[in-house]
Amino acid sequence: VGEGPGGLFASLRLIELGYRPIVLERGKDVRERKKDLSNITKTQKVDGESNYCFGEGGAGAYSDGKLYTRSKKRGSVDKILNVFCQHGANTNILADAHPHIGTDKLPRVIENMRNTIIKCGGEVHFQTKMIRLILESEGKLTAPDAAAGDRVIGVEAVNLATGAEETYRGPVILATGHSARDVYRYLASAKIDIEAKGIAVGVRLEHPSQLIDQIQYHNKSGRGKYLPAAEYSFVTQVDGRGVYSFCMCPGGFVIPAATGPEQLVVNGMSPSNRGTAWSNSGMVVETHPEDVAQFVKEHQSVIEQQEMKAQENASLFTPHSSLQMMYFQEIVEKQCWQQGNMKQTAPAQRMADFVNNRLSYDL
């Protein structure tokens, strides 16, 4: 369930093992997504099923295509890079220290991956949204008191274009990404074990590319004709808590990455040539569930309203819910939307003013 990076690579691995995967993707194919992304800028409205996070390729398809990680929990990076090259990515990524495909090149690569899945006997269904999991003991999981320990044997899904419901039988991989909050709500209401994890929370910094080039290359003239747009990496500890740069996009854009109405959150991306006049990077602090417990408790009435709007049972909420990090995200994103005049226009200020907790009079 989901055709982002997790779903794509899981499908390709299953094909290697002799299986024919069925991929269910709530969003549209990678080309059709472009129209909905354009509408975010034109109309300031976000399609809850097709946006910068939902659709073929997931959140990464139109947000850069950087292919490196600082995580210690990883498998064969070389194998992943080779799969990208087999599907049309530039072979430079096999040698680059920080491999990067680029937002303008990645959609074609993803399309080729989908075609491989289909040619090998798999199926890919777009605008097909999971409704519920099917359990071995009860058949259909509909009640929040379903017995724990049941084996999942399939999913029920709805075609968003036609309204038709379909049943798909077999083992299930949930590759729905971090933004499919309706999936987490469903899992919690069905009493399927989920666990809160820490997240990184922060802001996105934007600077003139030439400024970063001058600093990083120690040259007032910048990078010249032959050097790439400069990157930077920042890591430190503040009061025992990690603070670090994230998703640095030299010569790129800041983009709206909300997945529904009344939300505002941003991401960054770069085209393959990294040639724009601006560079940007996330600057985040690690945040743990215990950090937000009091905040969530203080906003319980707001959360209950959100739950009712999501057609969930608000009584399921407790201050120590496994969903508390998700609730925290939703509240902060709504507050940012309100500060952005209830549009997809991100509020901004100078970084020096932000860290000193004062208003900016200009940018």
What kind of region is each of these model predictions?
Residues 1-363:
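Residues forming the flavin
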